[in-house]
């Protein structure tokens, strides 16, 4: 096709996200040319992404770039990117845990890892954070098992359980679990208010604030922001960009990445109604949390953000620790409640000479949707 280049694409859901899984050796080696190709594939910049495969939603405008790894401790190298919707940018600052779940399945599908029954462990080196993730993928007849009876909130139906272990997730971007060395810091908002926050870096950096300190219950659903005149989103973005500077991730608020750090609003366990109308009982959860997905509120919750939230909740003295259940503190298992429901984390946390996270575990599902050829503008 004149003017266009053919590239192989696998389109896959990973957790509560969705995106294209691309082979690194089929993309331009020049980063700028590579990003132009990815933007063209997704139909960006355009709020509808009508001329590409993007779904006009931050949770479906994601990309994974994968290749076999030369590292002794990894089978594949995996780079995650947020593909801008209205903006012509691909942001590689942080990782996506949901898309990571699909990376393990993709590696087996492509033959990068020998399929071992009944479970294949895929060692994934995430280039965004320079951390290794183990994906435990069920296998049958030499192929990943997709069907199963494991359900995750935010995705209809059930699938095969894929367990992810994020190894040594602390200091993913800043080099420190507590980037400022403090369990709490004070920041001043643009409107002059001062609030307490906690800055934590585990799997991805995040800043935590109590919902009650901002005047909210913490159980608000994403649709709430459509009627409040942008107050909540603007306040959270003010907190997020201020934290980016404090964590050394940006020289100024204006220069902060749109994706990193995460900003998370936390509150104590309480009963609420999820987006699908189900009642989430307060006694079944350990913490309630809400987070942003770029310029909107997340419809569920980021896996890496969840790992950071669960970790923060178990570090004595953080704002998240002040609202998490006593049960979680005793077991190091955290059930986090989000707009679409809840999910569970297991955090191996020690405090011998400072706080240290050995690994963090979470379960997801993934589903390959399509594998074929995409047409993108050639250069």
Region annotations inferred by a language model:
Residues 1-379:
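A glycine-rich beta-to-alpha transition motif near the start of alpha/beta enzyme domains, typified by
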């Amino acid at each position: 096709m004149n003017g266009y280049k053919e590239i192989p694409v696998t389109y896959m859901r990973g957790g509560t996200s969705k995106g294209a899984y691309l082979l690194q050796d089929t993309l331009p080696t020049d980063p700028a040319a590579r990003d132009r190709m990815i933007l063209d594939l997704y139909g960006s910049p355009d709020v509808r992404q009508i001329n590409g495969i993007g779904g006009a939603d931050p949770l479906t405008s994601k990309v994974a770039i994968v290749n076999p790894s030369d590292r002794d401790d990894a089978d594949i190298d995996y780079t995650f990117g947020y593909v801008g919707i209205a903006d012509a940018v691909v942001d590689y600052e942080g990782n996506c845990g949901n898309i990571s779940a699909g990376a393990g399945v993709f590696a087996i599908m492509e033959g990068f890892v020998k399929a071992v029954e009944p479970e294949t462990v895929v060692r994934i080196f995430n280039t965004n954070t320079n951390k290794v993730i183990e994906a435990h993928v069920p296998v049958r007849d030499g192929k990943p098992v997709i069907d199963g009876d494991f359900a995750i909130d935010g995705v209809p139906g059930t699938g095969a359980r894929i367990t992810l272990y994020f190894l040594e997730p602390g200091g993913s971007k800043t080099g420190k679990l507590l980037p400022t060395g403090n369990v709490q810091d004070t920041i001043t908002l643009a409107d002059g208010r001062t609030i307490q926050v906690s800055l934590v870096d585990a799997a991805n950096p995040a800043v935590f604030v109590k919902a009650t300190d901002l005047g909210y219950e913490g159980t608000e659903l994403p649709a709430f922001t459509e009627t409040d005149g942008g107050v909540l989103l603007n306040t959270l973005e003010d907190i997020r960009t201020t934290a980016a500077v404090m964590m050394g991730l940006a020289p100024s608020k204006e220069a902060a990445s749109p994706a990193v750090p995460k900003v998370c609003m936390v509150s104590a366990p309480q009963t609420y109604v999820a987006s699908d109308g189900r009642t989430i009982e307060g006694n079944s959860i350990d913490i309630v949390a809400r987070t942003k997905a770029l310029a909107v509120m997340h419809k569920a919750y980021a896996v890496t953000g969840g790992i950071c939230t669960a970790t923060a909740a178990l570090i004595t003295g953080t704002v998240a620790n002040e609202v998490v259940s006593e049960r979680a503190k005793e077991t190091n298992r955290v059930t986090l409640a989000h707009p679409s429901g809840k999910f569970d984390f297991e955090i191996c946390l020690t405090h011998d000479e400072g706080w240290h996270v050995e690994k963090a575990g979470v379960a997801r599902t993934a589903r390959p949707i399509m594998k074929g050829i995409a047409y993108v503008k050639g250069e």
